């Protein structure tokens, strides 16, 4: 529950309608209290802090002026939605944010009528908003559609595809560009430079006095220049957005609540065509530790409100991300053709480790996965050795490029697929569930998954040495298992797995980091006198057919397990066994995958338990297939 404090106006705000009729002074106090609440909440739950702090005044202004949920408010990505949730009937549940059974960290249709469209991936808001606008027109309704998109999301082509459509169609909608010059990493590319020019170009001296009436000082080097650029563009039609058919207003101070309220009231009354309001905000606004941090506290763990110091976990093995980055950087010392590519995630993927050593060979292309893939293909086509590091969930955005530009041409692009499997607090939108199936379907691809951090290091080297076709290594978020990574790495033999424990009646074939759970399951089975072989597949493509056939021939039961959806590794194994006659002698096969649902957020451990992919689940499936053994004993061992 949110703590009730004396004289706190926010306690009386249950829905946006409670903002109506409030004085400007009240709204400013409510904004200050929302900012304080966001800091308090995220200090307890962890999450995305800086983005929300930057849009507090904008959020209060939008909900004060417009009539949500009848007016449709679509947030891009959703990192900045915490103030919105506080004002739309969810403030009493904010401390469940990103917790199992609690509020999502993003907008979510099933959570509230004030979330008309779910978000988590970038650059979708304008397309969705245009859909709402056209639906409104076709149904002869009269509501407004407002999309809020950050400058980082404007590096993706989808945003411009939607603007091109909306501008040509003259659809009545409002796009608010939240320009904080900071997505997760600093924005890159020509569009980022364009926004910078918009807010810093040489002022027209004759407009200075008028400009200062539009935007009051906000602590920037020359605040009036932002408004002057708008006035210059208004008079001369001089902005990219106007060329695309939008009526452009801005840049304006996104923290000046009076200006925002006045502008939005005027914009609300405009009835012709699409409008783009360009607001300039400061990520982390109002909380000094965030303002002074390089990443503006984009994503944080629990922290002290007083000092801003984030909680640190107990020291443990290095993360898979760090192992990838360190291995690539080490290989880069002896091979100057290695390049690293990331789509706005240099620190998340740890390509920044490589980039610090070799800045000329490190490319952050912004939120542009399609471009990242084909850019890597171009590098590979001319003899370079690109590693394209992208989260599994985001690689989906560039799948056509993977097929058309990489796979068909058999170009040796090396994909480092981060955040494979279940990721925890970010939930279904960020789960890396599908890459095993969608890459395994492509002719010629080499698909690998390590069982531990040493295996990952070897697979990075193995990818480097594959120079005649594309390859991919998938690995999860989080720490390794604590094995030692040898100084001298040796590449793997392509398409060959390994047996890590020999047994007789049951075979467990693991692809990826569920191997540790498979070994625990083997111990549980051994406690009942059941002998289990445990094998590490290493490759989903090409399969180790010799190993699979041996496991089928020498055991009564074969269980496959993977951190991916149906239609992946287990399906490949089953298809091979069916075609080679491996099922003809009565082998019992059980395929263990992620369930056929989109799982809600929770801790990764809880999510894998819900998915049925822990040691006790593996042992239970083996006993069920074998037809002997004590299932209740497995439960007792698991809870011991």
Swiss-Prot record:
Pathway membership, UniProt: Metabolic intermediate biosynthesis; 1-deoxy-D-xylulose 5-phosphate biosynthesis; 1-deoxy-D-xylulose 5-phosphate from D-glyceraldehyde 3-phosphate and pyruvate: step 1/1
Keyword Transferase among record annotations: yes
PROSITE patterns membership: TRANSKETOLASE_1, TRANSKETOLASE_2
Enzymatic class: transferase
InterPro entries reported in the protein's UniProt record: Dxylulose-5-P_synthase, THDP-binding, Transketo_C/PFOR_II, Transketolase-like_Pyr-bd, Transketolase_BS, Transketolase_C, Transketolase_CS
Record-listed E.C. numbers: 2.2.1.7
Name this polypeptide is given: 1-deoxy-D-xylulose-5-phosphate synthase
Organism: Hyphomonas neptunium (strain ATCC 15444)
Gene designation per UniProt: dxs
